[in-house]
C-alpha cells in the first residue's frame, strides 16, 4: 500500500514511501510508550500494532501451546491495532501467521520497553523475544528499550526510530537477525552521548529470593495459592489445604562489564546497538567436536 508521508527532515515536501511496519511490546497494549512509538512510526510508515493484552515483562520467548488465544481490536491508536491475550512471542507468531498472514512487513519494532534489555537480560526479555520471533520468520526486527523511563530518553529513542525508518538502515539486515537497541538513563542535564555498535554482554545477575508478605499473580494482583492432598496447586480458600509461602525475585546485574559490550557502553552514557542472530551454534565448539569425532 503506497501512502504519502511528510518528510520531517526536509522543507515540507512529500514523497511516496511504501513501507509496512508491525509494532509490538511486552508492557501491554495500554502502554503509553507503545502509543508513542506507533505515532512516531506512523510519520514514516504504514503501521500495524499487535501487542499483549496485559503486562508480559520477563516472560522471555514463552508461547501458548495448549492454551487458546483470543484477540480483539484496540482503540485510540493512529493505525489498525489489536491486543492478544498471550505473550509477546504469541503476538508476533499470531500476527504473522494469522491476522496478517497474507501481508508482507518490511520491519518489526518491539518496545519501547521501560527498563533496558542489554546483555543477558535479552534472554529473559519479552520485548527482545518478540523481535526474535519476527526474525525467525524472516522479518527484520528491532527491540528498543530505555534503561530508565523519562520524557527525554523516550524522545531520544523515538527520534532514532524515525531516523532508522527514514534512512532504511535496517534494509541490509541479514536474514534471521535482529537489533537490540538500548538507551542509557539520560536527561537534558546528562544527555545521551551517542550510539555505539556493541557486542552482547554476558554479565550475570546476583539473583536471590525474599519471602513476600502477600502473594501476587502475573498481573500483579494479590492471590492465594494452596497445596491440597494430591499436591496440585489451587487458588481458592480451603481449610484442609496448606497455604504456600510467596517469594519474590530480587537482585541486580553484576557490573563487571566486558569492554565495549552493550552493558559497558550504557554505563559510559552511550546508547548500544547490538546485532543478534537466531543461529545458536557455537562455531568453535562445533569445530572442536568435529575434530574430536574424526580422530
PLM regions and their residue ranges:
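Short, glycine-/small-residue-rich phosphate/pyrophosphate-handling segment
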Residues: 142-170
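A cross-family phosphate/adenosyl-ligand binding-site feature
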Residues: 21, 32-98, 103-104
Amino acid at each position: 500500500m503506497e501512502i504519502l508521508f511528510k518528510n520531517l527532515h526536509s522543507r515540507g515536501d512529500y514523497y511516496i514511501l511504501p513501507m509496512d511496519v508491525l509494532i509490538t511490546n511486552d508492557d501491554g497494549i495500554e502502554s503509553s510508550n507503545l502509543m508513542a512509538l506507533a505515532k512516531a512510526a506512523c510519520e514514516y510508515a504504514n503501521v500495524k500494532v499487535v501487542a499483549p493484552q496485559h503486562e508480559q515483562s520477563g516472560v522471555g520467548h514463552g508461547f501458548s501451546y495448549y492454551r487458546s488465544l483470543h484477540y480483539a481490536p484496540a482503540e485510540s491508536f493512529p493505525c489498525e491495532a489489536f491486543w492478544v491475550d498471550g505473550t509477546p512471542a504469541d503476538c508476533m507468531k499470531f500476527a504473522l501467521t494469522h491476522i496478517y498472514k497474507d501481508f508482507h512487513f518490511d520491519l518489526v519494532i518491539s518496545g519501547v520497553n521501560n527498563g533496558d534489555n542489554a546483555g543477558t537480560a535479552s534472554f529473559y526479555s519479552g520485548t527482545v523475544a518478540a523481535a526474535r520471533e519476527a526474525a525467525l520468520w524472516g522479518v527484520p526486527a528491532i527491540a528498543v528499550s530505555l534503561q530508565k523511563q523519562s520524557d527525554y530518553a523516550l524522545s531520544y529513542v523515538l527520534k532514532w526510530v524515525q531516523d532508522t525508518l527514514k534512512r532504511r538502515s535496517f534494509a541490509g539486515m541479514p536474514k534471521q537477525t535482529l537489533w537490540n537497541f538500548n538507551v542509557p538513563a539520560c536527561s537534558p542535564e546528562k544527555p545521551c552521548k551517542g550510539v555505539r555498535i556493541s557486542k552482547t554482554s554476558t554479565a550475570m545477575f546476583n539473583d536471590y529470593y525474599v519471602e513476600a508478605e502477600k502473594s501476587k499473580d502475573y498481573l500483579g494482583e494479590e492471590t492465594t495459592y494452596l497445596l491440597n492432598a494430591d499436591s496440585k496447586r489451587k487458588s481458592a480458600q480451603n481449610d484442609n489445604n496448606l497455604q504456600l509461602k510467596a517469594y519474590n525475585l530480587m537482585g541486580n546485574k553484576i557490573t563487571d562489564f566486558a569492554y565495549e559490550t552493550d552493558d559497558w557502553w550504557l554505563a559510559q552514557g552511550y546508547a548500544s546497538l547490538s546485532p543478534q542472530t537466531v543461529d545458536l551454534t557455537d562455531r568453535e565448539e562445533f569445530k572442536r567436536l568435529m575434530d574430536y569425532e574424526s580422530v
